[in-house]
Amino acid sequence: MSLKIVFAGTPQFAVPTLRALIDSSHRVLAVYTQPDRPSGRGQKIMESPVKEIARQNEIPIIQPFSLRDEVEQEKLIAMNADVMVVVAYGLILPKKALNAFRLGCVNVHASLLPRWRGAAPIQRAILAGDRETGISIMQMNEGLDTGDVLAKSACVISSEDTAADLHDRLSLIGADLLLESLAKLEKGDIKLEKQDEASATYASKIQKQEALIDWRKSAVEIARQVRAFNPTPIAFTYFEGQPMRIWRATVVDEKTDFEPGVLVDADKKGISIAAGSGILRLHQLQLPGKRVCSAGDFINAHGDKLIPGKTVFG
């Protein structure tokens, strides 16, 4: 079985699926990805990770600013592909595009739908304290992640998983599950599952201000925040008026009478801060213009300011 496929994706999450399709018996006719944009401190124009893979494999690359344009839609239809595979593309597909393929448009989504529809399912799952997430392969419709589900594969969320950890695991699971689903879809050997609207939750886009730590929250909630916002936008607090990023932190199973934000202790185990309930121990930190450092190195550099019983952060 060899399907003619149009692939649409942009970030690193989409790369394993594109690679899997390239290495399979299927034919990738073209790759749609978002236009090159300025990125980083120097605002250098960068191509997407998906574009890089397509270029390396000499696959035609198409980068429209929108697919609402009639000319772009006709171009898509003219490819006469069997199916469109969409993985974190970032552009809305109009009805004409959704109906342009014999087997429809199939999406790889990083949650167990209908939980966490939307832009940030990985981060929202960690923030909510979910114990599992996964991949859903979905037949796209005009709604936001509301289409019928072709397949699901669950993945445990450990107490130490960051968004980066889950991102990498789920991207690989998604690639494998997509190939399995395409084979069944072509044979007609697949049962579509309607989503339960009553169980739907929405994973709104992460805003930078969400990364600011409120020490009145519980240590458990703040630890989730640190994990969910690694590698971006990185949870942060303030130290001597400067934003201080926290890359790694753990919950200490102890009680304290200190007020939220007060330093409990600072030693080789880490820097322990009282939260609304419980204690959060900081292990990896970063001040502006500096490299990420261990708590031990931070103590060596700023130990004179780390006085137990004082409000040092926040």
Swiss-Prot record:
The keyword Transferase applies. It catalyses: L-methionyl-tRNA(fMet) + (6R)-10-formyltetrahydrofolate = N-formyl-L-methionyl-tRNA(fMet) + (6S)-5,6,7,8-tetrahydrofolate + H(+). One of its GO terms (cellular component) is cytosol. InterPro entries: Fmt, Formyl_trans_C, Formyl_trans_C_sf, Formyl_transf_N, Formyl_transf_N_sf, Formyl_transferase-like_C_sf, GART_AS, Met-tRNA-FMT_C. (6S)-5,6,7,8-tetrahydrofolate binds at residues 111-114. It comes from the Bacteria. Its EC number is 2.1.2.9. One of its GO terms (biological process) is conversion of methionyl-tRNA to N-formyl-methionyl-tRNA. One of its GO terms (molecular function) is methionyl-tRNA formyltransferase activity. Keywords: Protein biosynthesis, Transferase. Pfam families: Formyl_trans_C, Formyl_trans_N. Belongs to the Fmt family. Attaches a formyl group to the free amino group of methionyl-tRNA(fMet). The formyl group appears to play a dual role in the initiator identity of N-formylmethionyl-tRNA by promoting its recognition by IF2 and preventing the misappropriation of this tRNA by the elongation apparatus. This is Methionyl-tRNA formyltransferase. It comes from Coxiella burnetii (strain RSA 493 / Nine Mile phase I). The gene is fmt.
